[in-house]
């Protein structure tokens, strides 16, 4: 809803979790928003799961014909299994690599170009100097979002209290009192553990622009409506007070963007 209310002239792509396929895409209010975005020239993508094991392959295999007819421009994938699954079935829409399908150097970019995949997400492990050497003018750069520190089939809820078959979020705390958020995806039986503080490069905007990324990604995972609105205002509203307030409202990190060469 917050994206629906934003001016679309500055939005190039919207990527939605694949779970909207089969539920949300059939709902009128979601269809209305999709129609609005597409008429505004916004590209629409579905994001594939972090783990693409046999159960995911079976589900997507059963749904592939309907899935392939969705009003989308392509998909964002996070693993090789999803790539080969799509290629084996002749998927001919755009494929975008997420940041964990590493492209550290020109050899990596060339490999994927040979696979007819040219859109990628800049690796989170590289700093600004390394990103400049990589050349991300044909890639996306994550400028806001929580990072998965672990993706695991070892379900925390199942281990500690038994499987409830209900997806949700648990808070973990380590010996240094740092918090992590564990989201369990029961439909495909895996966990994603996120950092408490998201990456936020808004204060580095001039340096981000010097890299000329094709897209600047704002990635939402655990945010509620109010938090989402705050983040969007921080990036889309040019009023300096709004930008400053957005920075104060959220604890954040700049990730590896300012770090020295590893």
Q: What do these predicted regions represent?
A:
Residues 1-111, 115-262:
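Active-site pocket-lining/capping segments in soluble small-molecule metabolic enzymes
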């Amino acid at each position: 809803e917050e994206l629906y209310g934003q001016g679309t002239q500055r939005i190039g792509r919207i990527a939605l979790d694949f779970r909207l396929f089969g539920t949300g895409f059939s709902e009128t209010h979601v269809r209305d928003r999709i129609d609005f975005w597409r008429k505004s020239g916004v590209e629409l993508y579905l994001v594939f799961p972090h783990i693409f094991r046999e159960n995911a392959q079976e589900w997507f295999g059963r749904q592939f014909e309907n899935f392939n007819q969705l009003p989308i421009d392509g998909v964002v994938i996070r693993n090789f299994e999803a790539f080969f699954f799509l290629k084996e079935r002749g998927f001919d829409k755009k494929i975008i690599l997420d940041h964990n399908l590493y492209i550290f150097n020109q050899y990596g970019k060339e490999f994927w170009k040979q696979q007819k995949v040219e859109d990628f997400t800049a690796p989170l492990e590289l700093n600004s100097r390394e990103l400049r050497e990589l050349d991300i003018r044909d890639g996306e750069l994550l400028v806001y979002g929580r990072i998965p520190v672990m993706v695991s089939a070892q379900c925390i809820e199942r281990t500690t209290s038994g499987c409830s078959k209900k997806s949700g979020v648990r808070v973990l705390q380590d010996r240094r009192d740092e918090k992590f958020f564990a989201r369990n995806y029961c439909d495909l039986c895996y966990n994603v553990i996120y950092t408490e503080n998201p990456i936020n490069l808004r204060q580095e905007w001039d340096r981000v622009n010097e890299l000329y990324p094709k897209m600047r990604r704002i990635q939402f995972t655990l945010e509620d409506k109010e938090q989402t609105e705050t983040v969007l205002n921080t990036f889309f509203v040019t009023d300096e007070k709004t930008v400053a307030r957005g920075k104060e409202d959220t604890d954040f990190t700049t990730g590896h963007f300012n770090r020295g060469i590893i």
